[in-house]
Amino acid sequence: METDTPGSPERDRYIFRDGKGPNGDQPPTNWESHFGGPAWTRVPDGQWYLHMFTKEQPDWNWNNREVRDDFLTTLHFWLDHGADGFRVDVAHGLAKDLDRDDLDDYVVWCTSDQPDDGTHPVIDRDEVHEIYHEWRKVFNEYNPPAFAVAEAWVQPNRQYLYASPDDLGQIFNFEFAKKDWIRDAMHQAIEEGIASVEHSGSSATWVMSNHDVVRHATRYGLPQVPTSEYHQLAKDWVLRCVLSSWSRPFRRFF
């Protein structure tokens, strides 16, 4: 990864920190990347850069105005070329605050352990919505306005922030994708999905399947009861219910 020298404008586009230990040979935090191994990689001059996923995907420094402006240019490029909108992967992971002493106290990838007040150092910070408000202004320059949906694994009381009209406008509701073909489980997912959109004014989203879960046709056909007719009923009912409801359904096509 070529980023010039410490303190350079090029390096400031990313998140670099000095390491721990007498020689700085230990990562700045104890975090693991999403795909395993340390979330930090050391460069020859001794500093470490943050990558919440693979080392080939260094995290951007969203406090850098140049980074933000470049993304606005990219959004314009694709919308000018006919894109209808964007699925924003890991939408909760842009803004970060690493200038604190308690970083090792936080679990990075466990949603249930995340605070619900926007104070986690790297996940679902309040500042991320400043970024999306800028994006929304770009989306609204087009007629009709560009569509966007957040893939954001955040606490339920934080979901509406991503779905608000001045933000991305939609957020994936993954509860549907996590439920089995069981009456009470499906009922809970539907009721919670409808309730969650009342605060944002958005429409409900039903994620039936994506690349992280078993396809819905297979999942609803799993042998929870021993009759093939019941399995087919589950598949047909889910599609009819979801596709005819006041919502935006999402499914895996590839």
Which stretches of residues belong to each language-model region?
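Active-site and adjacent substrate-binding regions of carbohydrate-active enzymes
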Residues: M1-F254
